[in-house]
Structure formats: structure tokens, C-alpha cells
Amino acid sequence: MLVHLFRFGIRGGPVPGWSLQSLRFQTFSAARSSDDRLSSHLLRTVAQLRVQLRAHLPRAPPASHWSPSAWCWVGGTLVVPAVLWQHPRLCLIALCEAKESPPAQPTRAPELRFNWKLFWHFLHPHLLALGAAIVLALGAALVNVQIPLLLGQLVEIVAKYTRDHMGSFVSESRKLSVQLLLLYGVQGLLTFGYLVLLSHIGERMAMDMRKALFSSLLRQDIAFFDAKKTGQLVSRLTTDVQEFKSSFKLVISQGLRSCTQVIGSLVSLSMLSPRLTLMLAVVTPALMGVGTLMGSGLRKLSRQCQEQIARATGVADEALGNVRTVRAFAMEKREEERYQAELESCCCKAEELGRGIALFQGLSNIAFNCMVLGTLFIGGSLVAGQQLKGGDLMSFLVASQTVQRSMASLSVLFGQVVRGLSAGARVFEYMALSPVIPLTGGYCIPNKDIRGSITFQNVTFSYPCRPGFNVLKDFTLKLPSGKIVALVGQSGGGKTTVASLLERFYDPEAGSVTLDGHDLRTLNPSWLRGQVIGFISQEPVLFATTIMENIRFGKLDASDEEVYTAAREANAHEFISSFPDGYSTVVGERGTTLSGGQKQRLAIARALIKQPTVLILDEATSALDAESERVVQEALDRASAGRTVLVIAHRLSTVRAAHSIIVMANGQVCEAGTHEELLKKGGLYSELIRRQTLDASLTSTPPAEKPEDPKSCQSKA
């Protein structure tokens, strides 16, 4: 019956676009066969089936009669629920799905909100200076309000002198002119004062915000940096903080002054002519309402524009930071195209934002000019009717112009404030983040009790950026105190992940990692990384400072003699001394002025200067030539003596002397033993040895010289 229902349509034909292969069947277990729950579920299923089938059937005018298969549909719709109700354990429920279901809509990131609490934290230390700046700005604004009144009185004197032709214009206008000059001078001093204070407050706040943001970023989990680009983070430290600082200064310097001038001028206008002021009072709220509506859209555009700028900065930072790789592969054109594409998107967003702000300002100017025209028309009528003096009309016009300029300044400021709030929200977003793995806090094992015994017990782990893909699966490993344990295997087997968990860059999802019986999650992470574990990677990163400071990076309070000792242990003292500046030699950005072997030996010295109990060597010699590998390997052998060492190696020849070799595959231990024991087993380790030996022999054998073609010889002749 069910097959017949699915095979034939209500008009006697197959349902277009449907087949039996597109059906999914699901059997209900006995645990879900209670009458109430099952009956309601079955009724919902059949109803869904009918709706989906009806949606996929071709629309046509109603038929004059039903085909026999139509009665099957009607009967099936009525009978199937009853049959399934009575026999829930024996029947199959058909769940029909369209082959081409609409793709799931991506979840939109929540809109960032400005964190006023953090803003108050940075503003609080500067409240006294801010209060003084506000007082000075208000004073300057009030002075501006008084100027139109004096100008109106001066115009009235001019009109009186012109009308009556008596009296001395100079004697009558001298007092008002002096008052105006004094007001102009006071206005200039007040403006100078509040701008100086605002500059001081803005720069101090920007410095504090950058310090706090940089500190917060440094304390974030490694998983945070796995998901974020360096260029975007640098953009928040520089561009976003600068944008917020500029907006903050403008809000006080222009925004507060303009608002005060608008309020003061409106009071003066109401005293001069209530009728004209009423006209302004009707128009101004309407303009403010329109501006508020436009603001929400401009705010979203501003946020999108800043995010696009951060993406473009990330592309540029990535290309410039890896310029040697770009040059080696001749990919300058590709990187230019990538950056240009991001800039095009950024330019489009910025132009769209600019058009929105321009529209707002243009509409504002039209409205304000119409207000001036209306003021002249109505005010002129009042002057003609002897209801308003000519000087008062002049004062009203100047005051209304002050209102116009202030409102225009606010309209320009509006776009800046929108960008500033968005930039501040982006800055405060990362300040408010709390790392899952703290930098400090926890137990510190006394130095006399540290043995360096490491145990991985049933560890399961997947990277936060790739949840659900387990890199380690029920992984168990023991590193005895003072022994060398090597991890080998094919790429992607989880070797480097083991080192990352030991450094506690991440926490395992299941299981535990212990040091001398103490779970790493109970220990102080800074103490663990700073004193117990030394880490040497395949690509050591040096800072653009001197050799002395790079080695001392492992122990900031180390003396010069300790630096020299660590360099000797790392076989680095000799080549350092050969430089003209010795230990004061600047190595360049990321150590670009040094060879690979020299950088690696400096990294070894940096790790050894803190005398770690546990040493991690993550393919420390795989990128070196034979001679550099020999020198570095000597330093590593010397450094490994008496320490618990975890060696991650690709070249199996470097781990033959290890006390234990662990062969990893797919996040699990598949073989373990010494070099000789694993060779005897003839397993994966033996196969890896055979492959590397074969590759080495093929590389070392020179290709046979191909005889020249006689034709080519003749052409050369």
C-alpha cells in the first residue's frame, strides 16, 4: 500500500522529480512506541507527507472526475494512520524529503554593542581634566550665543544713525565694539584651553586602550589566534583605536559646543521673537527624527567597512610578513590581486557609507537654508508691521545662522560618531574576552620535587577550529624521567599536537596530561612554560633585536655570563663571536640576517638558558643541511643529557639513540620500542625506514648523462 502511494500521483502518474531512492525510512524502536507519543508523531508525519507531496505536484485545473489512483490516495491518507497506530512495532514510517532542500542560512554574527562599562574604566582617571574641558567648551559656546545679540544692537545703532542723521556713530558704537572684541578674545582663549585638554585626554585614553587591548590579546588562548588573522588584530590596535579617539575628541570639541550653541541660541531666539522661534521648534524635531532613522543604516555600513579594512590589512600583513616565500614562488602578482580585491570591496563599502553621509548632510543643508528663507520672509513681515525691530531681526538671523552651523557640524559629526562607536565596540570586544586557559594561577611544584615524568592518559583532542575531527583518539603515552622519547610517523598523525598539549596550549577534551602525577590543568601555566619546559621548533622565530636579547628572552633576569654559557652549550658562541658586534648584533626581523643553522642554535640557547627539566624538540633539524644538522644535533645531544626529552622527528636517523620510539598513525600509538626492536617487528617503522633509505639513495645517485643529439651539435656549429 505504501509503495503504491509513493509510486503513483493523484492524477494517475508518477510525481515529477520524485523517486523511491529519494525516500528515507526510519524504524521506531520499542522504547518510543507508547500510544500517545507515537500516535501524535505519526499524525504529524502523515500531515507533513501530504503537504510536501501537494507542493511537488504540478498545478492544474480541478479534474471533472478522479482517477482510480486518486481514491488510493484518499484511502491511504485515511487508512495509513490507523494501520500505523495499531501496529507501531511492525510498520515502517516513510519520511519524504525533497532532493534539493534549500541550503541552511548562515548564522549572522551578533551585532557588536558598545561597552559603556569599559569606556567608563578608561575615562574615569581623566574626569577632572574632562570636566575642565567641558566647562571651557560650554563657556566658548555661551560666548558664541552672546555675539549675535551684540551684533544686533550694533546694527540697530547703524540703522538709527542712518535714519535720524544725528549723534556720533563712533561714540555710540565704541562700547559695543569693545565688548565684541573682548568676547572674541575670550572665545579664542576658551577654545585653546579645551582643545589642549581634550588632546591630552584623548591621547592618554588611546594609549591606555592600546595597552589594555594588547595585554588582552597576548593572554588569549592559542585557539583564538588559530581563528583570527594577525592583520585584523593589528588593525584593531591601530586603526580602530585611532578612529575611536578622534570621535571622542570631536564629540566634546564640536558636539558639546554645537549642542550648547543650539540650546543657547534657541533661548535667545525665543526672547527675540516667539513666533519665529515656534517655526524653528516645529521643524527641528522633524529633522532630528529623520537623522535618527538614517543613523541605524549608516552604523551598519560603518561596521562592515571597518571589518573589510581589517581583512585588507590582514592580506597585506600576511604577504609582507612572508615576502621571501612570495618572492620565491614569483607570486607578487597574485598577492597584488588579492590585496586589490579586498581594497575594491573596502572602497565599495566606504563609498556606500560616504553616499549615505553625503545624503544626510545634503538634506540637512537644504532644510536649514529653507529655514533661513522662511525666517527672512516672516521676519520681514513682522518688521514691516512694526512688530519687530530691524536690529532684532538681524540678531535673529545671526543666531539662526549659529543654529544652522551648529546643526551642520552635528550632521558632519554624526558620521564620525557612528564610526567611532563601531570602532570602540570592536576594540572593547576583545578586551572583554577571557581566555579558557589562564596565564597564571595554579600549583607550582617545588624545584626539589620536579622529576620530569610525563603521562598522557586516554587523551582525546580536536582543535577548536575543527571541532568533531579528533586529532588524538584515546592516546596514551608515558615519558619517563630523564629519558628520550621520540614520536615518528606520517604527517597528520598528531605528533605536534602532543607537544602542544604538553605545553598546555590547549586542554584535552577527554583524558589527562600529568607532570609528576599532577594534572597540567592544576599547575601554573606561566611557571610550567617559563621554568619547566623548553621548546625548540622547526622554524625558530627570532625578534628584531640583538643576539643577547634574543637569548635572554628565555630568562629575562639572566646575567651576561649565563647567556654566554647557554650559547656555548648550543654551539653558538663561536659564530656569534665572529660577528663584528658579537652579541650586540641585530638579527633583523625574524632573524633574516642569519642562516637556518645559526637561528636554530640561538633558539637552542634561548631554551637552555632557563635550565628546563623537560625539553621538546619539534623537528629541530629537519630544515637544515647536512653540516648544519651535524652541529645542531651535537648541541641537542648535549642539551638532552639528564632531561626528559620529547623528540618529534621526520628524519628517522636522528632518533635511533632514543630510549623509546613511538610510531603514531591517525592519532593513536601503533608501535612502540627501540630502534632495533621496531626493525625486527617489520611494521610501519620498518616501512618508513625503508622509504627514507630508498629516497636517500635515489637522491644521492647522479642521473646518467644523456648523449647529445648530433643534430643539435650541428646546429651549434
UniProtKB/Swiss-Prot annotation:
Disulfide linkages recorded for this protein, renumbered to the chain, are: none
Does the entry feature the keyword Amino-acid biosynthesis, yes or no?
Answer: no
Give the signal sequence positions.
Answer: none
Which SUPFAM superfamilies does the record cross-reference, listed alphabetically? ABC transporter transmembrane region, P-loop containing nucleoside triphosphate hydrolases
Membrane-crossing ranges are 127-147, 178-198, 278-298, 365-385
Range annotated as the organelle transit peptide: 1-25
Q: Name the residues that bind ATP.
A: G489, Q490, S491, G492, G493, G494, K495, T496
Record Pfam families: ABC_membrane (PF00664), ABC_tran (PF00005)
State the Gene Ontology terms under molecular function.
ABC-type transporter activity; ATP binding; ATP hydrolysis activity
User: Where, per UniProt, does this protein localize?
Assistant: Mitochondrion inner membrane
Q: How does it sit in the membrane?
A: Multi-pass membrane protein
Q: Where is the ABC transmembrane type-1 domain?
A: 132-419
Q: Give a Gene Ontology cellular component term annotated to this protein.
A: mitochondrion
Q: Which UniProt keywords apply?
A: ATP-binding, Ion transport, Membrane, Mitochondrion, Mitochondrion inner membrane, Nucleotide-binding, Potassium, Potassium transport, Transit peptide, Transmembrane, Transmembrane helix, Transport
Q: Does the keyword ATP-binding apply?
A: yes
Activity-regulation annotation: Channel activity inhibited by ATP via ABCB8/MITOSUR subunit.
Q: Which residues form the ABC transporter domain?
A: 454-691
Q: Where is this region: Disordered?
A: 695-717
Mutant lacking the gene: phenotype: Conditional knockout in heart results in a severe cardiomyopathy and mitochondrial iron accumulation.
* Principal location listed in the UniProt entry: mitochondrion
GO biological process: one example: mitochondrial potassium ion transmembrane transport
InterPro entries annotated for this entry? Answer: AAA+_ATPase, ABC1_TM_dom, ABC1_TM_sf, ABC_transporter-like_ATP-bd, ABC_transporter-like_CS, P-loop_NTPase, Type_1_exporter
Q: How does it assemble?
A: The mitochondrial potassium channel (mitoK(ATP)) is composed of 4 subunits of CCDC51/MITOK and 4 subunits of ABCB8/MITOSUR. Interacts with PAAT. Interacts with NRP1; NRP1 regulates ABCB8/MITOSUR protein levels in mitochondria.
Family affiliation:
Belongs to the ABC transporter superfamily. ABCB family. Multidrug resistance exporter (TC 3.A.1.201) subfamily.
Function of this protein?
Answer: ATP-binding subunit of the mitochondrial ATP-gated potassium channel (mitoK(ATP)). Together with pore-forming subunit CCDC51/MITOK of the mitoK(ATP) channel, mediates ATP-dependent potassium currents across the mitochondrial inner membrane. An increase in ATP intracellular levels closes the channel, inhibiting K(+) transport, whereas a decrease in ATP levels enhances K(+) uptake in the mitochondrial matrix. Plays a role in mitochondrial iron transport.
- This one is known as Mitochondrial potassium channel ATP-binding subunit
Q: What is the organism field in this record? A: Mus musculus (Mouse)
